Amino acid sequence: ASFSRDYEVLATGLSLFEAVLFYTDVGELTKTQERGLLSFVDSGGGFFGLHTAAASFRECEGYHRMLNGFFNGHSPHMKFTVTVSDPGDPITEGLADFEVTDELYYLKHDPGKSHHLLQAYDETRDETHVMAFKHTCGEGRVFFFALGHDMAVLENPNFQQVVLRGALW
């Protein structure tokens, strides 16, 4: 595993990795960096978008097409139940519904292009929103998990299980 805040690695150095995880909403990608990331995924690399990854790089249309999600707001920080949509998937197998206190993300998302794994009901809006999904992109794999605002949710064992399994997928 390696950590970098330098987006230039997207343009030049992803061949050494099996997957990339984004947990950021800072800055923009250059066209070269975006092309490098998209080429990496299209060629068989994995991409894991966590929480603010859907709010990242607002000007990068290719990135958001690859992710199949674009941040469209969130609820107040509140308690809600995360429901398993597909208990037979390796990422969610054996996982029971669980409660968290976090932001409930609203995404612009095409549900027909991804396999939904987790969802949550927002009482404040009387709406159900996808919390985790996966799909392929070219030869690569893309996984997104919307939770992750603060330490309380990061320390939740169910959150950690989904993160680990999503990263391995």
What are these regions (language model features)?
Residues 1-18, 168:
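Aromatic-Pro/Gly-enriched surface loop or interdomain linker
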Residues 3, 49-50, 144:
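Hydrophobic residues in well-ordered beta-strands that form the structural core
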Residues 4-9, 35, 126-132:
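Alpha-helical scaffolding within the catalytic cores
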Residues 7-9, 26-29, 53-57, 122-124, ...:
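Solvent-exposed loop/turn segments at secondary-structure junctions
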Residues 124-126, 136-169:
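Extracellular ligand-binding/catalytic regions of CAZymes and related secreted enzymes
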